[in-house]
Amino acid sequence: ISAYSQVSMVRSKTLIFFDEVQECPDVMTWVKALVDEGSYIYALSGSLLGVELKDIRSVPVGYMSEMQVYPMDFEEFVSAVGVPENVLEAVKKSWSEKTPVDAYIHEKMMQLFQLYIIVGGMPAAVQTYIDSNNIQNVVKEQRDIINLYKKDIARYDQDVRKKLYIDEVFDLIPSELNAKNKRFILKRLNENMTFGRHENDFIWLKDADMALPTYNVEEPVSPLKLSEQRNLFKLFQNDVGLLSCQYSSGGIQLKILQGKVNVNYGSVFEHTVAQALHA
């Protein structure tokens, strides 16, 4: 590595970064020996790790700590687009002291919130907006991400029917969030479809970080897990910007920026909150 990069490696200080480790799952096993040897610091990253690394030969328990990366939340987004830290601190102070936010700051933050609903928190989409200040370019980037998701779904299983079910479930998320019954209805895909038969397909979408399931509970008493009803749930996209992109056939981005009232903001706002809580 040192010869290739022409950079000297310093014991205990050099960080060696392995990216896209899902393409070589054995790295997860080998890293144990590398850590034991002790010369360098190692970081591993990749995509779809929740599903791609389930069958690795030996999990290096005790040799690594795991960090989950999520799409940017609203605070991270406004920092990325250039809002000074002192402005964010002023908003936080008003919140904690229960005092009104300066009117000008309030107006600008609301405009940025509308922008966040459109751009979302996917790093590539945010960077595209920063570089171009063009929503159409952002939508193109988001569509590319969604298309990559669909390609990953196509790799899921040899069973073509399972691939089609997952693809259809993913496409149905936007309309299901608008449904009056407030939960995902499997029969909209197929009259004979049951959660028990296809639970693993929903779990795959969750483990692949493409969707966020939120389960109903019989009563709002802690711990919620004890009264969880796994067959009654809502399914959110993993990013509000991707959700807006899936809604984009009606020109929702422009309507949101213009503050139009003929937009169903309920599902979009609900999704934004779900995404923030998950992160």
What are these regions (language model features)?
Residues 36-57:
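Sensor-1/coupling segment of RecA-like P-loop NTPase cores
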Residues 53-178:
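Interdomain motor-coupling "hinge/lid" segment immediately C-terminal to the ATP-binding subdomain
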Residues 127, 131-279:
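Accessory nucleic acid-recognition modules appended to NTPase machines
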Residues 29-33:
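A short acidic, amphipathic alpha-helical/loop segment
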